[in-house]
Amino acid sequence: CEETIDMKKTAILLYDSFCNFEISVALEILALAEKPITVFGITKQAIRSEDGLSIFPDDTIDNLDLDAYDSLILPGAMDIRETIENERIVDFIKKFEKKTIGAISIAPLLLVKAGLLNGKPFMAGINKEELFEEGFSESDLTEMVGWDDNLRKPVEEGYIITGNIIT
């Protein structure tokens, strides 16, 4: 008689121009750990990566059963502006506030927009100056380590952990 453990899943949120190679590495690690995942999108229509790969999500963000998940992964993207302005996506992310969140490359900006990084240190794969041009304020980015910051003074481990959020 095999004992089964009811393992919670990891939600993967994909959006237009997501970075395929960033999410592929994370998915491989989860697969090796036999961690179940669900890929979410705004709709069940194919989502196109920045390199042209189309992925069909397993479910829509409206069908989330939060209790079935213990974590969320947000990939980077070539252009995240439309995604940041989508309130449905921001609301989806807010639901994971008390869960583990991994935000890759530029994806931490989604967490800033969702109010999950207020006053907390984080790393994002972009220069701060570019974000001011996109409407982010100095207070939004006070604790941010960007590309230029990391070149001047590298973060030793290559990521920043703030409570339940990894950037």
Model regions: which residues?
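Short, Lys/Arg-enriched N-terminal segments with co-localized hydrophobic residues
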Residues: 1-6
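Active-site-adjacent pocket-lining segments in enzyme domains
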Residues: 9-18, 32-42, 58-59, 63-102, ...
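Short N-terminal binding/cap micro-motifs at the start of the first secondary-structure element
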Residues: 18-23, 48
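Hydrophobic residues within alpha-helices
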Residues: 25-26, 92
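Rossmann-fold NAD(P)-dependent oxidoreductase module
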Residues: 29
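Membrane-interfacial amphipathic helices and adjacent loop/beta segments
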Residues: 40, 45-51
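Short gly/ser/thr-rich secondary-structure transition/capping motifs
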Residues: 51-59
